[in-house]
Amino acid sequence: MLDEKSTRFGFRTIQFVAGGFYLNGQRVELRGLNRHQSYAYQGYAMPDSIQQLDAQLLKKQLGCNAVRTSHYPQSPAFLDACDELGLLVFVEMPGWQHIGDEAWQAQALQNCREMVCQCRNHPSVFLWGVRVNGSSDNEAFYKRTNEAIHRLDPTRPTAGAHIRRREQLLEDVYAYNDYSYRGRGPACEARASVTPDTRKGYLISEFGGQNFPAKPFDDEAHRLVQALHFAAVLNDSIAQQGVAGSFGWCLADYNTHREFGSGDRICYHGVMDLFRNPKLSAAVYASQKTPRAPSDIVLEVSSAMALGDLPGGVPGACWVFTNAESVRLYRGNDFVAEFAPDRRGRSAALPHPPIEINDFVGSLLEKYEGMDHA
């Protein structure tokens, strides 16, 4: 009897330079999310079909072109789906914050070798994560992880998620968890103030949900602030020269230990909930897709306009996350106004900035009550 195994592979060129990321010679803006392969009730034990579904959600529903496997290599079925869909994968070594003793480091180094051997035939894999996420500098250890991975795969660059400015850069790309945004001012730090070597590639490996969690049952105003937070950092990472792209934190809510999260062992950091139901923040990503058919149009309104849910029964800020050129507001059959994205506003660098609805009346008071709209 003959055992047989088929392995798919592909060819493409990858380059990180000071000016950004290039795939097959074309500049590509990385727009992705981090992914925990954790699910409600089942944990990590979901079958291949559900692992593949996450790749489809990222690519088709959310319009992402990249994903970071935080903080460990993930299901082969997920990587297979990323290959098929054309979803770039930043694969990361296992670990979180802690670096142990010599025996621990030897095992971590072996984990790195196994990660490369298991994943290197996947053309979707474009970047190796060789630092333990959130850890401090350790020159001797991280020299070994870089060398081990480059020895097994000299074709792909290495990176590692740094949590402080100007940490030691042994990798090919400086990846930075940028949680600097607090709702005003620049939404991400200046690249030149973070990386110790501006000649190398630079990307934002995390931002967003950890700074501003939102439960799916939070009120509209809270969910809107989270969505606008994601939009602001996405915008500023695109606008800043030399940033290869960003990975928002994160795809979906996930279970955690009691010391981290909201006290119920759940982190509500995702743009989707544990069951993969989208929150408003998911529309920030989905609305950046280029519509090629009417079915590709995304239209998500931040408010249901249910007066009983609004403080004082008064509508507050209302935004539409859409990739349409404009939206029209009607009150019943009466036309109120047409609204378009502000191409000079806070989100001007986005392909499709969210649209603010700031007039709910138009000329209706004049029409029905004889009142001057002015």
Predicted segments with their positions:
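Substrate-binding/catalytic cleft of secreted carbohydrate-active enzymes
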Residues: D54-K60, A66-S281, P294-D309, G316-C318, ...
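An acidic-aromatic loop/edge-strand motif
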Residues: D3-T13, V17, C250, C267, ...
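Secreted/periplasmic carbohydrate-active enzymes, especially glycoside hydrolases
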Residues: M1-V89, N111, F126-L127, T145-R151, ...
